[in-house]
């Protein structure tokens, strides 16, 4: 149950309704989400490794339950998410997927631990435009996921597909 009273239901779900207290800001949040999900050039598994890592950190019920629309075509299933949850020990994730999860974890918990050695590993696997993409994705995942967790927005009855 959300920790703030929700406006009249919009039909879009509580993950949207809570933000409708400030419609202009809600529109901006929606546009940012659309830009991130629609504009990323990261592979789906890389994006999902970063997104799910931050969802675990944020304890965002909505984010933890959200799945990718094209998941089956990219072998993104419950087993994949279990591997992401244990990315350090996973032998099933690619180097880029593990790095995306590690980047997301450091981004969310200790961005100052992103030292030159870590950036060298990142730049050995990703081009600079991909690192900019990953950074913007993680910013959106962290900010919006944390906001929904703070407000206490529950996962919807019907899973969100992105």
Regions from the PLM with identified roles:
Residues 11-18, 43-59, 89, 125, ...:
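Alpha-helical scaffold segments that form or flank carboxylate-/histidine-based iron centers
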Residues 49-54, 84, 88, 100-108, ...:
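Short alpha-helical scaffolding segments that buttress acidic/His motifs in well-ordered protein cores
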């Amino acid at each position: 149950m959300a920790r703030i009273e929700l406006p009249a239901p919009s039909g879009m779900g509580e993950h949207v309704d809570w933000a409708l207290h400030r419609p202009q800001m809600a529109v901006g949040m929606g546009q940012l989400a659309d830009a991130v999900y629609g504009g990323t050039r990261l592979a789906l598994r890389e994006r999902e490794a970063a997104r799910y890592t931050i969802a675990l950190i944020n304890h965002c019920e909505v984010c933890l339950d959200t799945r990718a629309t094209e998941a089956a075509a990219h072998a993104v299933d419950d087993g994949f998410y279990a591997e992401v949850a244990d990315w350090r020990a996973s032998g099933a994730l690619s180097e880029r997927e593990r790095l995306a999860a590690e980047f997301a974890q450091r981004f969310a918990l200790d961005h100052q631990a992103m030292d030159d050695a870590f950036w060298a590993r990142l730049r050995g696997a990703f081009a600079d435009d991909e690192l900019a993409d990953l950074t913007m994705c993680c910013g959106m995942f962290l900010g919006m996921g944390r906001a929904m967790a703070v407000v206490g927005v529950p996962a919807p009855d019907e899973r969100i597909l992105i």
